Amino acid sequence: MDTERSSEICGNVPDVTLSTPKGKVFSTPKGAHKRTPYSGHTKVNSSFKSPVQTSSTSPAKPEEEIEELKKRRAKLDSEIALLEKDGIRVDELEQHIDLLHEYNDIKDIGQSLVGRIAALRGVTTRDLYGQFGLELDD
């Protein structure tokens, strides 16, 4: 990096001289990121371990995947048939699911409001539940 570009990035900050673990000296603008001090540990370049979990099995072939999806669909169809046999309609289930979603949204908003009121009053939400006559399981 040339001096002109260095001052452009770091402003008019004086340079600082640093040294590496092997005694090599180099300079860097003051305030620039410095390297982690040398720990003396010899295995610096160990193999990288990804935090992403990978399956030990190889990816399924498209034909196998299609068969698995067909089995799953057949199982779901049989469950729907059993529910219909018990007198429950699919559209009724969809309505119940929609109502549960609406209930959960309203409950989340209510809990958020109780939390804000508790923060303003400097008390816990547990205290407010008691004041409002609510059960902690609500």
UniProtKB/Swiss-Prot annotation:
It is found in: Nucleus. GO terms for cellular component: nucleus; Swi5-Sfr1 complex; Swi5-Swi2 complex. Residues 21-66 are annotated as: Disordered. InterPro entries: DNA-repair_Swi5. This is DNA repair protein SWI5 homolog. Component of the swi5-sfr1 complex. Belongs to the SWI5/SAE3 family. Signal peptide: none annotated. Residues 42-59 have a biased composition (Polar residues).
